[in-house]
UniProtKB/Swiss-Prot annotation:
Subcellular location as annotated: Nucleus
Protein encoded by which gene: UBLCP1
CDD domains per record: Ubl_UBLCP1
Effect annotated for changing G10E: No effect on proteasome binding or nuclear localization
Residue span(s) of domain Ubiquitin-like: 3-81
Complexes and interactors: Interacts (via ubiquitin-like domain) with PSMD2/RPN1 (via C-terminus) which is a 19S regulatory particle subunit of the 26S proteasome.
EC number, UniProt record: 3.1.3.16
Organism: Homo sapiens (Human)
Name this polypeptide is given: Ubiquitin-like domain-containing CTD phosphatase 1
Stated consequence of mutating K44A: Aberrant diffuse pan-cellular localization and loss of binding to PSMD2
The protein's required cofactors: Mg(2+)
Length: 318
């Protein structure tokens, strides 16, 4: 019986339709080699487990109880020259085509149709609380791709693509902020990424909850047409006793994602080409200090996060 599987690797999805339940995990890896060029011994397939343990190569696919078109994430690097591995990743339209949001804010932020969409998300979107909100803490909302790790470069493990100082950053932030992850992908991939990076299991901090693309809304802008955004109003509507405009900050490498809440957004520099930039990227180290400084404030509304480095430099010079 044919068992169609979808494998995600290097920012692309590959459809596997020629294997059956009698084929083995090694057969799957051999087939993926023809699609991706990654040798079987270099492949790590996330989510293929038997009795809670990673499936060995000789395990038959039928024993994994996979549903048709199950999506699997693959980690692994091609056997190619280091120069090729370090080459530029595919163009990311979200980064290249991002635009300055300031001109569009007035027309979008308070439009009734957009506020109604947020109200629907507040009512209908189900949030799985991983750790209860803490009284008196501020809120830090974090994007994933290009913010916390480089999701386009190739590597054997997610840790190789992790942004430098990630765990130190989250540990420090957790002292003053509840931490929420919000990615424009689906929850399965978010959970897999957080597990691979060691975020969801770290003992030094806790994630309050995670949001996926289903919590986003589509808005119409005069110049850019329809775009998807991350409205913080969804969080504020669901957790109004804890979070508001006054105590929330959101990091994202794509400025338009906080088009509905520009006052609360900080556009972080994207972390790309991890192999080249791992030793040079200090963004999270500096932002750790910024979060610590503004945590002293009762109200974030007087801040302009666009100039966060200037603010930090001024405070540290006092």
């Amino acid at each position: 019986m044919a068992l169609p599987i979808i494998v995600k690797w290097g920012g692309q999805e590959y459809s596997v339709t020629t294997l059956s339940e009698d084929d083995t995990v090694l057969d799957l890896k051999q087939f993926l080699k023809t699609l991706t060029g990654v040798l079987p011994e270099r492949q790590k397939l996330l989510g293929l487990k038997v009795k809670g343990k990673p499936a060995e190569n000789d395990v038959k696919l039928g024993a994994l109880k996979l549903k048709p078109n199950t999506k699997i994430m693959m980690m692994g690097t091609r056997e190619e020259s280091l120069e090729d591995v370090l080459g530029p990743p595919p163009d990311n339209d979200d980064v290249v085509n991002d635009f300055d949001i300031e001109d569009e804010v007035v027309e979008v932020e308070n439009r009734e149709e957009n506020l109604l969409k947020i109200s629907r998300r507040v009512k209908e979107y189900k949030v799985e609380i991983l750790n209860p909100p803490r009284e008196g803490k501020k809120l830090l909302v974090l994007d994933v791709d290009y913010t916390l790790f480089d999701h386009r470069s190739c590597a054997e493990t997610g840790v190789e693509l992790m942004r430098p100082y990630l765990h130190e950053f989250l540990t420090s932030a957790y002292e003053d902020y509840d931490i929420v992850i919000w990615s424009a992908t689906n929850m399965k991939w978010i959970e897999a990424k957080m597990k691979e990076l060691g975020v969801s299991t770290n003992a030094n901090y806790k994630i309050t909850f995670m949001l996926d693309s289903a919590a986003m809304i589509t808005v119409h802008t005069p110049r850019r047409g329809l775009i998807d955004v991350k409205p913080l109003g969804v969080i504020w509507g669901k957790f109004s006793e804890f979070y508001s405009k006054k105590n929330t900050i959101m990091f994202d490498d794509i400025g338009r994602n906080f088009l509905m809440n520009p006052q609360n957004g900080l556009k972080i520099r994207p972390f790309m080409k991890a192999h080249l930039n791992r030793d040079k990227d200090k963004e999270l180290l500096k932002l750790t200090q910024y979060l610590k400084e503004i945590a002293k404030l009762d109200d974030f509304l007087d801040l302009n996060h666009k100039y966060w480095e200037r603010y930090l430099s001024k405070k540290q010079g006092q």
